[in-house]
Amino acid sequence: TSSTRVLTDEIIDESIFGNTTSFLTFKMFEADGILGINFQYLQKSKDFLTPICIDKNTKIVLELANGKQVKLVNSTDLTTCNELQYDAINKNNLRVLNGFFYFSPENFTDLKTEKVYLIKITANTGDVNFVIKPYLNSEIYKTKSKPDTYFIENLKCLGL
């Protein structure tokens, strides 16, 4: 029998600067013993937004407080880009990038005890970096969270 457990979306990073708003959310999952995250990176701006494309070589790198790195690999060989959309009502350009990334079995142990201070998406169109805050008071979601302990808290929920 197969088993899948999926946690709810949590906001990891939010940026509101000038005409541009962006945010990153993670949804952790475990499917038949494989641990991964579904991420979504949304950008909204009155200005032009540069496209981001991910492919089979794209990785997500988590920089931990102890100096170690945890790397996640893309779950697909397909190239995916955040296509430009236009919100005519609010006159905003929108780009949404989604992806599924897996941990290798041996490399997520440190996430049980170490805070994450930087998340880097190594895309084929260039790296995207997120400096992770200890506390996030989201203006978009109207929530408060502790993104740097996301993995410490949520790995427990999956019984890992």
Where are these regions (language model features)?
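Sec-dependent signal peptide cleavage junction
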Residues: 1-28, 44, 157-160
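Short, surface-exposed loop motifs enriched in S/T, G, D/E and P with embedded aromatic residues
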Residues: 1-3, 66-78
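Short, solvent-exposed beta-strand/turn "edge" segments of beta-rich domains on protein surfaces
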Residues: 25-34, 49-51, 88-90
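Short amphipathic, basic-aromatic surface patches that mediate peripheral association
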Residues: 39-51, 107
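Short coil-to-beta strand junction motifs in C2/discoidin
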Residues: 50-58
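Short conserved beta-strand and strand-loop elements enriched in small hydrophobics
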Residues: 58-63, 119
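Glycine-centered tight beta-turn/hairpin loop motif at sheet-sheet or coil-to-beta transitions
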Residues: 65-67, 125-126
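Internal interaction segment
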Residues: 72, 76-160
